[in-house]
């Protein structure tokens, strides 16, 4: 079995490679792709095949997918450019005759009104039309989106536009492990997995930060424009801030809520919880 992993220089792609190795896939049967192979040197030292590839360069993708049996297609990071970039990946996979494409999408991509969902929906539609066997991993939010803000929460509290909505966030490591399970076991072709961890509200997030830190941390719910301004004032570019605020709007209406059972079944255990992730981050 040869498995090609795109985006291996990114957080999720790297974790997927590590999960494949832990599951016993020989290093020489894993191909890690990145724009800059220098950033994959440590994997090469461990026997992983590394190749340069760029979603904007179809020739590099075709060369990178040579002899690939399975393709772990990690969605691109350039919001607004994903549709043409993902087209290049799918077309290169089709030309290479890849046996299975596993794509990281977003929760409820086919029906979601999140700004982030449109490009994933278009990619899913193109995958279906391509004739390639595929699996859709519709990942919800990352727990790291919250644990990475711990210092800010302690200083300023938790702010957002999520209301009482619940978000099914899980760690990148758990999403990566689930992807590795799909890549190394049979019976997944054609499946759509809605993946997420145990759900929580922003009020529950603030309460858990309070419990673990001993500080009084509260959640302040804001209108979407006001929350966007908070994010911009914190240094985020306006388009990115607007996208994050829109995600909170979606959380308020259930856009990032999924039952935990799909992820739990793939992992063979319950996913890491918010409380556990905060404990590690603290």
Question: Which residues fall in each region the model found?
Answer:
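Compositionally biased, low-complexity linear motifs
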Residues: 65-69, 282
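A hydrophobic C-terminal alpha-helical subdomain
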Residues: 224-282
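Conserved Rossmann-like nucleotide-binding pocket used by diverse enzymes
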Residues: 4, 51, 267
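Short loop/helix-cap segments at secondary-structure boundaries that form the rim of catalytic
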Residues: 39-46, 63
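Rossmann-fold cofactor-recognition segment
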Residues: 44-57
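Conserved beta-strand segments of the P-loop GTPase G domain that flank and frequently precede/overlap
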Residues: 74
């Amino acid at each position: 079995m040869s498995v090609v992993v795109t985006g291996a220089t990114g957080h999720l792609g790297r974790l997927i490679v590590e999960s494949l190795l832990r599951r016993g896939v020989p290093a020489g049967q894993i191909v890690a792709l990145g724009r800059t192979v220098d950033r994959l040197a440590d994997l090469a030292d461990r026997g992983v095949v590394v190749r340069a590839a760029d979603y904007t360069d179809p020739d590099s993708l075709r060369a990178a997918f040579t002899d690939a049996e399975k393709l772990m297609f990690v969605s691109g990071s350039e919001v607004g450019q994903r549709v043409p970039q993902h087209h290049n990946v799918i077309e290169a996979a089709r030309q290479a005759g890849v046996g299975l494409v596993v794509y990281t999408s977003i929760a409820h991509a086919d029906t979601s009104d999140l700004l982030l969902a449109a490009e994933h929906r278009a990619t899913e539609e193109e995958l279906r039309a391509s004739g390639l066997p595929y699996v859709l991993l519709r990942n919800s939010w990352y727990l790291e989106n919250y644990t990475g803000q711990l210092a800010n929460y302690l200083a300023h509290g938790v702010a957002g536009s999520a209301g009482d909505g619940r978000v099914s966030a899980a760690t990148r490591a758990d999403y990566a492990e689930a992807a590795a399970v799909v890549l190394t076991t049979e019976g997944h072709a054609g499946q759509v997995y809605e993946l997420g961890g145990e759900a929580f509200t922003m009020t529950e997030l603030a309460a858990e930060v309070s419990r673990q830190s001993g500080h009084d941390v509260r959640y302040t719910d804001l209108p979407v424009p006001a929350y966007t301004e908070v994010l911009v004032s914190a240094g985020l570019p306006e388009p990115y801030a607007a996208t994050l605020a829109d995600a909170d709007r979606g959380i308020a209406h259930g856009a990032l809520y999924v039952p935990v059972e799909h992820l739990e079944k793939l992992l063979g255990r319950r996913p890491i919880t918010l409380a556990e992730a905060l404990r590690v981050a603290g």
